[in-house]
Amino acid sequence: MRNILLIDGNNLMFRAYYALPPLRSLSGKLCNAVYGFCNMLISAIEQHKPDYILVAFDKGKKTFRHKLFADYKAQRHPTPEDLIAQFPIVKEMLDTMGVKYYDDDRYEADDILGCLSSQNSQDNVIIMSGDRDLLQLVDKSVSLQMN
């Protein structure tokens, strides 16, 4: 049985961004979300020792849910620009680390995580997210690490 670690990338980025003070790189760019994301990722790898890792991201585009319900996520505040600027840096870091990530215009990260957890139900799947909606995926082979 393989250990598969699935990570809600947007959730971790938001958590790191709001949890840490506004850290800056030597060039002056804000990097608190990158720093926090990296620390949480390394901690999860050390704790779970996964055979496979995938980080799922939202693309921030309207999905099929917006067509079904016009007010879907209408109450959400827009993502801060200085957080948006850190997403490409995290993706570059993941590439450098050899960690796969996936995003799709049509789906949100939790859709991707749900699909992958279902497809790998014969394995030990650990989902890392603070999104309580993902609790519905928990079963004998899928656990949720709330961050």
Describe the function of each predicted region.
Residues 2-128, 132-147:
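Noncatalytic, basic helical substrate-engagement surface that gates or grips nucleic-acid strands
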